[in-house]
Amino acid sequence: MVKNSIIPVISQEKKEKNPGSVEFQIFKFTDRIRRLTSHFELHRKDYLSQRGLRKILGKRQRLLSYLSKKDRIRYKKLINQFDIRESQIR
């Protein structure tokens, strides 16, 4: 996933790039999560990075739950766009 390719998709409705938006923050966390998981294929015992990954996953989950409460349509669109599994715990 390339940063430049996704920014226009996120800011398409607002006609401006807003790095503080919930969608952009979720994109950044998702990008970091995917990079870290590919890192773990080579470095299985990198426990410090695994802890960082768990922290990032928690932050992304909190943002996703916030977005699902505020705007369910944007939440569903974002989940489908980034191929994120929907949380079962509410």
Swiss-Prot record:
Primary subcellular site in the record, as a coarse category: plastid
An example Gene Ontology molecular-function term: structural constituent of ribosome
Keyword Chloroplast found: yes
SUPFAM superfamilies in alphabetical order: S15/NS1 RNA-binding domain (SSF47060)
Locations listed in the record: Plastid, Chloroplast
Keywords: Chloroplast, Plastid, Ribonucleoprotein, Ribosomal protein
Gene Ontology cellular-component annotations: chloroplast; ribonucleoprotein complex; ribosome
Any one biological process term the GO annotation gives: translation
Highest taxon of the lineage: Eukaryota
Any one Pfam family match given in the protein's UniProt record, by short name: Ribosomal_S15
SMART domains the record matches: Ribosomal_S15
Tagged with keyword Plastid: yes
InterPro entries the record matches: Ribosomal_uS15 (IPR000589), Ribosomal_uS15_bac-type (IPR005290), uS15_NS1_RNA-bd_sf (IPR009068)
Family: Belongs to the universal ribosomal protein uS15 family.
Record note on quaternary structure: Part of the 30S ribosomal subunit.
HAMAP family to which the protein is assigned, alphabetical: Ribosomal_uS15_B
Name of protein: Small ribosomal subunit protein uS15c
Organism for this UniProt entry: Glycine max (Soybean)
Gene it is expressed from: rps15
